[in-house]
């Protein structure tokens, strides 16, 4: 006659192959109950009942495929999910994946709202240059450059023969006679408003030269000396301005001016034979 085990004590005393009864589980509603048996540190048999709440959630396809992987080793015959005998569940780590827009918004909130990132190029204050209270005054470098240019132009018009300033020969006394003699020799070029800009970098281009001098005044011709083989700048250039006062302003403003990590040298162009 077949005997039935009716109490937990009878289950413990039952003769099993490994000394422990098999684990069993059943589902009731949204809960899953798992009953297991094991030996404690004192060598005694204990019964462990675990309760799981069943929740349904939508997971990425990669996660669903990973859960269907075939188990191997000691877990070859295990059911889906972790096995307490071979798997130890550590601290649960929650990860949240956000898009680039959400990251930008989060990063902006971490910035110090009291710190002003604007810096004025005129007075180095903590505001934008367009809102600078010193804009248009002597502290403005652009205004200072325009002031120097206007002063140099006025000086060139009022006193062209001032000591220390180069004056072309045809503007000196008797220059007109000399100029008329040389007219038939091909010297019909007017260099009175030409300047020579030296100490230029090798990477200088015609566009850079145009940007350098266009704010001073209109010019009629430019020449940038280049190496024949490499095509690099030789270090000097000539600019013919339309008006002599603009040429004087260019010398006053650009001579000694830092450009491309070099100090420019600007002077009147010497007459060519």
Curated annotation (Swiss-Prot):
GO biological process: formation of cytoplasmic translation initiation complex
Keyword Electron transport recorded: no
Primary location class: cytoplasm
Residue span, RRM domain: 193-271
UniProt xrefs under InterPro entries: eIF3_g, eIF3g_N, eIF3G_RRM, Nucleotide-bd_a/b_plait_sf, RBD_domain_sf, RRM_dom
Keywords: Cytoplasm, Initiation factor, Protein biosynthesis, RNA-binding
Domain of life the protein comes from: Eukaryota
Organism of this sequence: Drosophila simulans (Fruit fly)
Identification of the protein by name: Eukaryotic translation initiation factor 3 subunit G-2
Record's GO cellular component terms: eukaryotic 43S preinitiation complex; eukaryotic 48S preinitiation complex; eukaryotic translation initiation factor 3 complex
Disulfide feature: none
């Amino acid at each position: 006659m077949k005997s039935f085990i009716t109490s937990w004590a009878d289950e413990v005393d039952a003769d099993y192959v490994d000394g422990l009864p098999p684990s069993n589980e059943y589902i009731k509603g949204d809960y899953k109950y798992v009953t297991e048996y094991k030996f404690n540190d004192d060598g005694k048999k204990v019964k462990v009942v675990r309760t799981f709440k069943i929740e349904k959630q939508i997971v990425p396809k990669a996660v669903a495929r990973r859960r269907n992987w075939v188990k191997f080793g000691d877990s070859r015959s295990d059911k889906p999910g972790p096995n307490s005998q071979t798997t130890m569940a550590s601290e649960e780590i929650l990860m949240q994946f956000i898009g680039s827009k959400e990251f930008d918004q989060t990063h902006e909130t971490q910035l110090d709202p009291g710190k002003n990132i604007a810096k004025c190029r005129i007075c180095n204050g903590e505001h934008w240059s367009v809102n600078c209270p010193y804009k248009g005054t002597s502290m403005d470098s652009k205004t200072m450059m325009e002031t120097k240019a206007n002063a140099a132009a006025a000086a060139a018009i009022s006193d062209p023969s001032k000591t220390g300033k180069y004056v072309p020969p045809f503007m000196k006394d008797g220059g007109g006679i000399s100029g008329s003699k040389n007219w038939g020799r091909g010297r019909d070029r007017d260099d009175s408003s030409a300047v020579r800009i030296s100490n230029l970098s090798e990477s200088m281009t015609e566009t850079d030269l145009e940007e350098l001098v266009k704010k001073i005044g209109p010019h009629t011709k430019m020449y940038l000396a280049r190496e024949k083989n490499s095509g690099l700048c030789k270090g000097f250039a000539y600019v013919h301005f339309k008006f002599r006062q603009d040429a004087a302003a260019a010398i006053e403003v650009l001579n000694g001016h830092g450009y491309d990590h070099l100090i420019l040298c600007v002077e009147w162009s010497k007459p060519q034979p």
